[in-house]
């Protein structure tokens, strides 16, 4: 299976910025993946990205033949010629066709993706937030991610990353949904992949503290009142004892 993955991925170049300390035990502080590309016989046919510490720097749109930066401000300081990516994709296509002939078109094994949904910030009703759907262990890199609100498809405020590479040659992908948390809205991240027998729905809804019952509120108020009265009584006792001590001291002084 790993062999099949390696054949499909094509060229993968990794550059690591290594820690200056340590001789035998060298640890990478940062890892940049330059020219991560794959080509496959099913859509999307391929992808070319640059990554840094697991985050996407940019990808090359193979249809428009343009470099698309994850953070557009980076394009002011550095540039990348998309023709280099197109050449890599041509090599990947040729390599894939050759290996398919050599392997009698044996397909790679479909992995079962893992899905996690969480909010970017602590949830406060009515305050803007972002839902994050992390789809991990993707192989092959073909997946549909859809957001549902109360069972209905949502398209506004949705964005997603490219397929991001992992050391085991699988991929992960992240989908984002900007939204206003509401007590009467629930959300699902719907994932479709060849490794699943049916679409997977990962449920999310805001966690709202349950309101206290009238009995609980009464008990809390009574407890607070009792503690307050006890504090007054104890304070009064201490004041009386203090006054008596002062009076006794003065009496002894006169004697």
From Swiss-Prot:
Superkingdom of the source species: Eukaryota
Entry keyword set: Adaptive immunity, Cell membrane, Disulfide bond, Endoplasmic reticulum, Endosome, Glycoprotein, Golgi apparatus, Immunity, Lysosome, Membrane, MHC II, Signal, Transmembrane, Transmembrane helix
InterPro entries associated with the record: Ig-like_dom, Ig-like_dom_sf, Ig-like_fold, Ig/MHC_CS, Ig_C1-set, MHC/Immunoglobulin, MHC_I/II-like_Ag-recog, MHC_II_a/b_N
Residue positions the entry lists as glycosylated: 104, 144
Alpha-2: annotated segments: 111-204
Subcellular location: Cell membrane; Endoplasmic reticulum membrane; Golgi apparatus, trans-Golgi network membrane; Endosome membrane
Role of this protein: Binds peptides derived from antigens that access the endocytic route of antigen presenting cells (APC) and presents them on the cell surface for recognition by the CD4 T-cells. The peptide binding cleft accommodates peptides of 10-30 residues. The peptides presented by MHC class II molecules are generated mostly by degradation of proteins that access the endocytic route, where they are processed by lysosomal proteases and other hydrolases.
Chain segments annotated as coiled-coil in the UniProt record: none
Gene source species: Homo sapiens
Family: Belongs to the MHC class II family.
Main subcellular location: membrane
Stretches in topological domain Cytoplasmic: 241-255
A UniProt-annotated Pfam family: MHC_II_alpha
GO cellular component terms attached to this protein's record: clathrin-coated endocytic vesicle membrane; endocytic vesicle membrane; ER to Golgi transport vesicle membrane; Golgi membrane; late endosome membrane; lumenal side of endoplasmic reticulum membrane; lysosomal membrane; MHC class II protein complex
Segments traversing the membrane: 218-240
Signal peptide as annotated in the record: 1-23
MF (Gene Ontology): MHC class II protein complex binding; MHC class II receptor activity; peptide antigen binding
Ig-like C1-type domain location: 113-205
Disulfide bonds: 133-189
Topology class, membrane: Single-pass type I membrane protein
Name by which UniProt lists this protein: HLA class II histocompatibility antigen, DQ alpha 2 chain
Chain intervals for the UniProt region annotation (Alpha-1): 24-110
Residues in compartment: Extracellular: 24-217
Subunit-structure text: Heterodimer of an alpha and a beta subunit; also referred as MHC class II molecule. Dimer formation with HLA-DQB2, but not with HLA-DQB1, is required for efficient exit from the endoplasmic reticulum (ER). In the ER, forms a heterononamer; 3 MHC class II molecules bind to a CD74 homotrimer (also known as invariant chain or HLA class II histocompatibility antigen gamma chain). In the endosomal/lysosomal system; CD74 undergoes sequential degradation by various proteases; leaving a small fragment termed CLIP on each MHC class II molecule.
Tissues where this protein is expressed: Restricted to skin Langerhans cells, although some expression at low levels may occur at the surface of B lymphoblastoid cells.
GO BP annotations, alphabetical order: adaptive immune response; antigen processing and presentation of exogenous peptide antigen via MHC class II; immune response; peptide antigen assembly with MHC class II protein complex; positive regulation of immune response; positive regulation of T cell activation
């Amino acid at each position: 299976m790993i062999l099949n993955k390696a054949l499909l991925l094509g060229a993968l170049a990794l550059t690591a910025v290594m820690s200056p300390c340590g001789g035998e035990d060298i640890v990478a502080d940062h890892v940049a993946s330059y020219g991560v590309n794959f080509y496959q016989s099913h859509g999307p046919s391929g992808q070319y990205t640059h990554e840094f510490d697991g985050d996407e720097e940019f990808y090359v749109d193979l249809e428009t033949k343009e470099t698309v930066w994850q953070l557009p401000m980076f394009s002011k300081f550095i540039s990348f010629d998309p023709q280099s990516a197109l050449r890599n994709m041509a090599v990947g296509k040729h390599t894939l066709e050759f290996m398919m002939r050599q392997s009698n078109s044996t397909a790679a094994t479909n992995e079962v993706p893992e899905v996690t949904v969480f909010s970017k910030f602590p949830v406060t009703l009515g305050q803007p937030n972002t839902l994050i759907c992390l789809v991990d262990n993707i192989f092959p890199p073909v997946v549909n991610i859809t957001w549902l609100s109360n069972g209905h498809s949502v398209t506004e405020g949705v964005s997603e990353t490219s397929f991001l590479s992992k050391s085991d040659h699988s991929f992960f992908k992240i989908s984002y949904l900007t939204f206003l948390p509401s007590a009467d809205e629930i959300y699902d991240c719907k994932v479709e992949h060849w490794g699943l027998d049916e679409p997977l729905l990962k449920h999310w809804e805001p966690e709202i503290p349950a309101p206290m019952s009238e009995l609980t509120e009464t008990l809390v108020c009574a407890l607070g009142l009792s503690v307050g009265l006890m504090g007054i009584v104890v304070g009064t006792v201490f004041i009386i004892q203090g006054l008596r001590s002062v009076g006794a001291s003065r009496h002894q002084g006169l004697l």
